[in-house]
Amino acid sequence: MEVIKTNIPGVLIIEPRVFKDSRGYFFESFSQREFDDKVTPILGHSIHFVQDNESMSSYGVMRGLHYQRMPYTQSKLVRCVKGAVLDVAVDIRKGSPTFGQHVSCLLTGRDEEGMKIAEQFAKVSVQKRIW
């Protein structure tokens, strides 16, 4: 797994190690051990995911801006399994030096890339393509 920092602390791009051959491909979509080894040092604290959600949107549908208020905030690990989606994380943390700034990432079912979004960020996604 490769972890790529963005211009906003708390938002990371996650690229899994993918094994491809003539039969198809395989990769670990999540490993707590690897996440702890590679992401925790960057964030400065550990994260333990307790919920896994999946959604499907028709072409052009925009979902968001959504977020959770304290004490129910959630960190997110987002990826696209089919088609393409533009995912955007917006810093809405009051007093943050990056308040109001955003990071966008085009996630596709072809590259297995994901985006880690910190707590207290708003998120929006737009379905770009369905394969």
Where are the language model's segments positioned?
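Non-catalytic, conserved peripheral segments adjacent to functional cores
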Residues: M1-D111
